[in-house]
């Protein structure tokens, strides 16, 4: 069974889940799994380390599993153990091989690696594999084959590597070895992951990387990568991965929309304070300001803010959303379409969405195979009656325990009632399975 099919059958969630609103906000501190962004960066750095690295608090989800499986297929020794403190995490032990990335295949029989719809795995492995020898082929699911890769491929070709792709997207074939040059520049207008991919491998490759577009090296996820490289135990040791701030935003948002007095009865344990995750700023953005930028204020959690904006007391404007169009789905259009279906007054102009206070109603929400669409609208359903989430299993990408967290009784969850499409109540243990 290939990686795509296997991961689609590991989460036996119903085709549709209805969220029953809570009548009040529970006073609870929940845990959320580790940061996806940090976990997949740490896996690459651990593979390049001179010695064994133990990653504590690592996220265990589709995106991180495809990275682990790709590294294992390359020949890395990786041990995965349960995390007693968080069911969505694992302790991952990686035996690094320094700069000796295992060799690939041949021109006629390249070593093939599957990356699903994980942008981090697709971009990071593309640069990482250039450090090896031989021929590698990367492929993913259909949506990953539609997502941009051109700026990264251009930079790697500038370094002297041969990468074959019919349209500068996946699937692609990497002919490792080289480089001829030691300098390149990369544009991050479409994705900052292009720069992060190059920076993670730059020391081993002897590359000097210039970054163009947006805020350059100061762009939040690029800055995260640089900070992580500096802090990482590259001679071996232990590294603690902090909780995922994007995933935590749903619980801060839930507490906010359920609270009548502006307090924050729902909080997230071990909330990140390293400054690495821009979405750790989310609690400070509540109540929502009049204007918010995806580039300057929030990352993926700006989707959470947009989803709850119709419940705000004043109009909210969300700007510089262009990158959302190039991710798991066309997120700007998806948010506008599904919020409108729920009764929201929302206007799209260029890469800006303007959301007005609205009386919302229940609806059957398309998720577009996008984990964040499912989680955003499930959060909204904790307040708005009749929200029904189609294809809820898409949360397996980054937060497989999400619906279980909603349904688990206080103090370990929110204690919400979730139902299947036939109106049957779902138990927490029915909402999560690897």
Q: What name fits each language-model region?
A:
Residues 2-434:
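Structural preference for solvent-exposed beta-strand-turn elements
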């Amino acid at each position: 069974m290939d990686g795509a099919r296997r991961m689609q059958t590991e989460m036996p969630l119903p085709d549709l889940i209805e969220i029953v609103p809570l009548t009040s906000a529970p006073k609870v501190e929940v845990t959320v799994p580790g940061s996806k962004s940090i976990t997949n960066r740490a896996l690459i750095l651990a593979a390049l380390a001179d010695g064994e690295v133990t990653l504590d608090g690592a996220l265990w989800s589709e995106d991180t599993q495809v990275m682990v499986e790709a590294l294992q297929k390359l020949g890395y020794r990786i041990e995965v153990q349960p995390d007693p403190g968080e069911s969505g995490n694992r302790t991952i032990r990686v035996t690094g091989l320094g700069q000796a990335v295992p060799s690939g295949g041949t021109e006629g029989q390249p070593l093939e690696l599957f990356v699903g719809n994980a942008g981090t795995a697709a971009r990071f492995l593309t640069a990482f594999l250039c450090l090896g020898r031989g021929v590698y082929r990367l492929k993913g699911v259909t949506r990953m084959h539609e997502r941009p890769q051109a700026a990264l491929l251009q930079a790697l070709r500038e370094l002297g590597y041969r990468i074959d792709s019919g349209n500068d997207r996946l699937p692609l074939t990497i002919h490792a070895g080289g480089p001829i040059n030691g300098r390149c520049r990369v544009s991050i207008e479409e994705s900052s992951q292009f720069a992060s991919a190059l920076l993670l491998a730059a020391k081993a490759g002897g590359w000097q990387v210039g970054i163009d577009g947006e805020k350059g090296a100061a762009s939040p996820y690029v800055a995260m990568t640089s900070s992580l490289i500096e802090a990482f135990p590259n001679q071996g040791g232990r590294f603690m991965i902090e909780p995922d701030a994007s995933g935590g935003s749903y619980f801060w948002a839930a507490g906010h929309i359920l609270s009548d007095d502006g307090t924050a009865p729902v909080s997230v344990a071990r909330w990140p304070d390293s400054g690495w995750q821009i979405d750790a700023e989310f609690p400070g953005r509540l109540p929502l300001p009049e204007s918010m930028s995806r580039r300057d204020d929030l990352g993926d959690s700006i989707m959470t803010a947009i989803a709850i904006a119709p419940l705000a007391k004043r109009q909210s404007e969300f700007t510089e959303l262009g990158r959302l169009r190039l991710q798991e789905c066309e997120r700007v259009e998806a948010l506008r379409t599904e919020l409108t279906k729920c009764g929201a007054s929302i206007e799209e102009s260029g890469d800006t969405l303007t959301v007005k206070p609205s009386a919302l109603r229940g609806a059957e929400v398309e998720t577009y195979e996008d984990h964040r669409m499912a989680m955003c609208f499930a959060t909204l359903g904790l307040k708005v009656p009749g929200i029904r989430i189609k294809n809820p299993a898409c949360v397996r990408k980054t937060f497989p325990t999400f619906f279980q967290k909603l349904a688990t009784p206080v103090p370990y969850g929110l204690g919400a009632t979730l139902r299947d499409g036939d109106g049957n109540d779902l138990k927490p243990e029915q909402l999560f399975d690897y």
